[in-house]
Amino acid sequence: MTQTALLQDLEARGLIAQTTDMAALQELLNKESVTLYCGFDPTADSLHIGSLVPILMLKRFQQAGHRPVALVGGATGMIGDPSFKAAERKLNTPDVIEGWVEKIRKQVEPFLSFEGENAAVMANNYDWFGKMNALEFLRDIGKHFSVNAMIKKESVQQRINRDDQGISYTEFSYSLLQGYDFAELNQRLGCKLQIGGSDQWGNITAGTDLTRRLNQTQVYGLTMPLVTKADGTKFGKTESGTIWLDAKKTSPYAFYQFWLGTADADVYKFLRYFSFLSVDEIASIEEADKSREGKPEGQRILAEQVTELVHGKAALEAAQRITHSLFSNDLTNLTADDFAQLAQDGLPTIKLDKSASGLIDALAAGGLAKSKSEARTFIQSGAVSVNGIKVDSLEHAIGDGERLFGQYSLLKRGKKLYALVDWQ
């Protein structure tokens, strides 16, 4: 891909919100292999799916021959970015942040290549801020920032203008830290481009200005739009919570199901944002879906692409196997690990003692019936199955033979209501 084609592709995908100087950036990318960076602050022990857009942007640039730097904010994570946040962040202890830094580093690494001429680099801004004292910070960095200009930034104004929440000097100083990151990475690695979400525009331009002042070097910024949904609800959240990249926090099955549930109004945009299918391929999928009778293919393709990208082929196959088994009512191909995923976050799950094996009690405990009386009615009407096999006896007790892998029984009422029993 030529460098002109790279920016054209990003624009066609809708992935460019703003640049500090598009023409000059285009010229730079055409002229040389550029080192670029994106920062990831450790605000939790895992990144969520909103972080995928910048991670994949680093990957897109690397595939085009440029060198990506993933900067984990071991120092900035101790402060907290106030950008468009309604309230002050909770400050976490250094040892907690250090653990989160390591987890995030391990999450980002698999997306990038650390071999070849444009091998990726992992960095941690604690390496330079940890050695800097307050006087150095105020003299060498602070003197280059105008408080007048900082106060005018939209993200700061939103906090200042709230009666219930102001902004501390700690968070107010955040943009100085992020700005210095750019200057430091420019000095250390020749970094000339910073990318980030559109909410980072103020911090990014602080960095381009500071780098020009400190290093007498022209550098650039590029932001991506924040991911939004057509219905106005928050992207990356479900009724059960945030969708994380860590498989221990969001199972690959739940992750796959999240993408399968994408609205028709969002699916093709998300394919452009989150997949490496070409814009033309995505347009063809959209066109075929318009004329297709029945369910569109876009959601399945999106779920497959992103699940494999994040969790790998084996995890995708497991998610597909679980999905097919539940749909077909045939559990014979499921593994113990598959059931563990369902118990983690795939289905409503209850823990029962093996001595409490009555089906009526289990239906009530699992929320498939409001009462034992209602449970009896459902059983008698043939609406209840255990592990895919219908049960019509009111005296039915769930025996050892129905405890798959000695631990799990899948209860179902009607066509779509499930409860997984995890026997203790």
From Swiss-Prot:
Give the residue interval(s) assigned to the motif 'KMSKS' region.
234-238
Fetch the InterPro entries from UniProt: aa-tRNA-synth_Ic, Rossmann-like_a/b/a_fold, S4_RNA-bd, S4_RNA-bd_sf, SYY-like_C, Tyr-tRNA-ligase, Tyr-tRNA-ligase_bac-type, Tyr-tRNA-ligase_bac_1
Q: What is its EC number?
A: 6.1.1.1
Binding residues for ATP: K237
Q: Does the keyword DNA-binding apply?
A: no
Domain S4 RNA-binding per the UniProt entry, residue ranges = 357-422
**Keywords assigned by UniProt?**
Aminoacyl-tRNA synthetase, ATP-binding, Cytoplasm, Ligase, Nucleotide-binding, Protein biosynthesis, RNA-binding
Please tell me which stretches of this chain the record labels as motif 'HIGH' region.
42-51
Task: Specify whether ATP-binding is a keyword of the entry.
Answer: yes
> GO cellular component annotations, sorted alphabetically?
cytosol
Protein residues bound to L-tyrosine? Y37, Y174, Q178
User: HAMAP family, from UniProt?
Assistant: Tyr_tRNA_synth_type1
Assembly description:
Homodimer.
Q: What this chain does, per the record?
A: Catalyzes the attachment of tyrosine to tRNA(Tyr) in a two-step reaction: tyrosine is first activated by ATP to form Tyr-AMP and then transferred to the acceptor end of tRNA(Tyr).
**What's the family?**
Belongs to the class-I aminoacyl-tRNA synthetase family. TyrS type 1 subfamily.
Its protein name is Tyrosine--tRNA ligase
UniProt organism field? Chromobacterium violaceum (strain ATCC 12472 / DSM 30191 / JCM 1249 / CCUG 213 / NBRC 12614 / NCIMB 9131 / NCTC 9757 / MK)
